[in-house]
Amino acid sequence: NIVGVATAIVSGGPGAIFWMWVMALLGMMTSYAENVLGIYYRRKDPAGGWRGGPMYYLRDGLGGKPGRVLAVLFAVFCALASFGIGNLSQLNSIAGNLQAAFGVPEAVTGAVLAAVSAVILLGGLKRVAAVAERLVPAMALLYIVGALTVVGVHITAVPAALAAIVKGAFGLQAAGGGIVGYGLSRAVTWGFKRGAFSNEAGLGSSVMVHAASNVKEPVQQGMWGIFEVFADTMVVCTLTALVVLTSGFVEPDTGRIAAGAAGSALVGQAFDAVFGTLGSKLIAVCILLFAYSTTLGWSCYGCKAVELSLIHISEPT
């Protein structure tokens, strides 16, 4: 939502944001479908709670040996992904930004977060949910208010930024020497990559948590899937893009990064231009909250994947 959007602009130009929006529109549909299926095919566990996810709707929906094989494969790959997309990349962003903003050694950050994570995760899904329901609104509000302030200061540059996004999406801008790989292909590639990485729509991972919801109607949970993709990409990621493109560190007409700008650190530099040195510190805190909440969520996904593949996939259909 923060670093990823800046990277997309650096690597694919402003047009990458347009294709990120396209990915979000497609993602709303896939998120709706996977969450409806997750509720429809979920089952009661011995404790009276709900368990479900792609393993269940692949196994029970497709049926037979192909369904079981795909269910187990999903669980294995989801467990592996929890160490990559859900852990290593997130903690690397946290440690790097805290070291740059506050001088905290990366090893210290890793040790502290590991200890705190252990305490939270040992409490199970309910404790993770309790932490997330307090953390997510606070972090979203903090970042959105900060981003709106930056965009408000540069409000006159917003039309040019939006025009750059549309022109860049179809390769209509002049090539900029400071950008890595301009043109339609790069814009589409980076827009779709960062869109999928941002909202996870279609990956099936978040369905395991959605399936535990106390709702009776599958469509209701499917609508929540649509909303979370919209809020994540269309609101937060778009704000990040406008922060970067209106800051003066990227030339809207060419997409070229201005001299002295630092690629993936563009968001922090844009905040510094408005808030002074407090800006990069604010971004470091936002990245800490965003990335750490992602780590907690993916830790649950990994545990659920292992649990459901080793224990529940073998139960009768």
Where are these regions (language model features)?
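Extracellular loop-to-transmembrane helix junctions
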Residues: 10-48, 232-239
